[in-house]
Amino acid sequence: MGRRLPATITGLAMGFIETLNNIADRIEGCAAVIIFGIDGIPIERQVRELDPSADIDMVATEFTALVRRAMRTAADTELGEMREMVLVTDDMSFLLRPITTDYFLLMAINPGGNIGRARFELRKAQLSMEAEFAI
């Protein structure tokens, strides 16, 4: 992937793969789930039922602009921190949860997928990963 991660994150890479795999297994319609940094560079991913023409890494990179703007808007309006972002398109839904202010979980869900379950599973994963990413 080309990105050098802090030693604590590198040592946990297998744990991240397992976590993402478990999330994807529990959510009907999960196309992909990815951990990426605020710079848009993917750290780890699990791809399941993703259309071959869809590039989940590109989606994550593009999401960084939305995430930065949403975080800035939340701070500027004093509404608190951004907790979750949802984007629904004709072909796919995307759920995003911050792990920290610098790292995020993004899930792509195919039409008919279980968005409620996805929200629940991403929240659980976010809580379990917070300490691992707090460097």
Please identify what each model-predicted range represents.
Residues 2-32, 38-135:
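Acidic, low-complexity cytosolic segments
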